[in-house]
Amino acid sequence: TQSTGTSQTIAVGLWGGPDN
């Protein structure tokens, strides 16, 4: 899951997968 934002990345990571 690619997100353009730190908060977005963390939020998506909860139900998508950690980007960092």
UniProtKB/Swiss-Prot annotation:
Keywords assigned: IgA-binding protein, Lectin, Mannose-binding
Signal peptide bounds: none
Biased composition (Polar residues): 1-10
Region Disordered, annotated ranges: 1-20
GO molecular function: D-mannose binding; IgA binding
Family listed: Belongs to the jacalin lectin family.
Note: Two isoforms exist, a major form and a minor form. This is the major form.
Subunit annotation: Tetramer of four alpha chains associated with two or four beta chains.
Known function: Alpha-methyl-D-mannoside and D-mannose specific lectin. Binds IgA.
Listed name of the protein: Agglutinin beta-2 chain isoform 1
Organism, scientific name: Morus nigra (Black mulberry)
Origin organism lineage: Eukaryota, Viridiplantae, Streptophyta, Embryophyta, Tracheophyta
